[in-house]
Design a protein with these regions (language model features):
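Sequence-structural signature of mature extracellular/luminal beta-sheet repeat domains
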Residues: 1-165
């Protein structure tokens, strides 16, 4: 890769996983999920990896609450899970609310998680508040993905992978 007049060499930081998804940088570590490998990984800048097995959950989107706990979108069970550093427990069961498996997720500075369903049409985005209140905040989406909250915290932006916008 060349940027300007400098030549850069890209070097892999980590490998050995199946389908990396939902990368987040938190407390000096890169966190990411491996949906097909059913785990969440961390890796530091030296390439040292650790693994949190999540058999039966197919984790996708990740996000951190202000207290440092990790939220995990469980693709197949359609649950949002919370990892506090020791245990993994369900925070919200969205199976009766979302039309398809869960996908991307982003968490704002107030600890509210915005989770997309991977429906090719009729998808929704659900907000899970810290008190576990669940609210559908957007609907009729074509595979919502790639969510980000603007730095001022006022706008949630989302790509529609199938809708191509």
């Amino acid at each position: 890769m060349t940027l300007g007049s400098e030549r850069m060499t890209l070097t892999p930081l980590a490998n050995g996983f199946c389908f990396g998804e939902g990368p987040r940088w938190f407390e000096g570590l890169l966190w990411f999920s491996d949906m097909l490998g059913e785990a969440v990984y961390t890796v530091n800048l030296h390439g040292d990896m650790s693994k949190l097995p999540l058999t039966g959950h197919a984790p996708s989107g990740l996000g951190f609450r202000p207290d440092g706990s990790l939220l995990i979108a469980s693709t197949e069970s359609r649950q949002v899970l919370r990892y506090d550093g020791e245990t993994v427990a369900p925070v919200a069961d969205l199976s009766d609310i979302v039309p398809a498996s869960l996908g991307d997720m982003v968490v704002d500075d107030l600890g509210r998680a915005y989770v997309g369903s991977q429906a090719r049409e009729g998808g929704v985005i659900v907000r899970v508040d810290p008190d576990e209140t669940v609210t559908v905040v957007a609907g009729d989406l074509d595979f919502p993905n790639g969510m980000v909250i603007t730095p001022d915290g006022k706008t949630l932006m989302v790509a529609e992978s199938v809708g191509r916008h």
